Amino acid sequence: MRPYDALHAFRHSLYGCLHRRGDALFELIDAILTADPVPAPVHLSLETSHRRGWGSLYAALRRGRIDAEALRDLLAHHPLAESEAPVYAVDVSVWPRCDAESSPQRGFYYHPSRHSAGQPIVAGWAYQFVAQLTFVRESWTAPVDALRVHPDQEVNTVATVQVEALLGRSPMEGGIPLFVFDAGYDPVKLQQGLESSPCQILVRLRAGRCFYGDPSLAGPPATTGRPRRHGPKFDCKDPSTWPEPTAEHTCEDAPATGRYA
């Protein structure tokens, strides 16, 4: 097999997911992948990889149809790299739409670089992405799913739906898949939602979180008064409160490309 045969087969399958205005949508995808950030979609029509006019671009956006389920199946069957167990990252990205007051179903979300009235909160749309990662030191990821998170939806519930759907589409090869989440997710809700799913979850905890052990660990129960409700305190930012670990895992710190766990 020639080196580019796999890429050619993938692009052919990708084209098969574009059911209406397929040629225009396919060139639009190439333009997005090869262009620098642009202020508006029409600027993509100036890219060399986009051989059509701006009218064709807007017609594709308005009338084009993409088979989303077929596209998800295609991405799930093309892993980023061979590994013992696949690793996926789940996170939310916000598209600010502060000035689009007539846009439907805008919500208010945290944004690290955009502010409104002095607060890091913006009006816009939230999208939750699932991307495959590898333990190789590189900047590439492989997005496998994206869903719009509506204002009346909760990110942990949407994440559970995405993970279960991905497990059903992906070939069960290698080890148990690992899904990593940022600190904005609730590990208890995720564990309850994915309890019967063949996967592992890893959630980053904020440094300011505190936990309390079982009351029986705090010593013998008091003979008077209300029984203890909490045991020893575990403060994530205070090592003096940490008990003896039951297991240890050493992480490799790579400042140039981030920290690997």
What are these regions (language model features)?
Residues 145-261:
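An internal, acidic/charged active-site-proximal segment
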Residues 24, 36-39, 52, 56, ...:
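Generic alpha-helix structural propensity
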Residues 32, 48, 79, 166-170, ...:
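Hydrophobic, Leu/Ile/Phe/Ala-enriched alpha-helical segments that form helix-helix packing faces
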Residues 1-63:
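Gly/serine-rich nucleotide phosphate-binding loop at the start of the catalytic core
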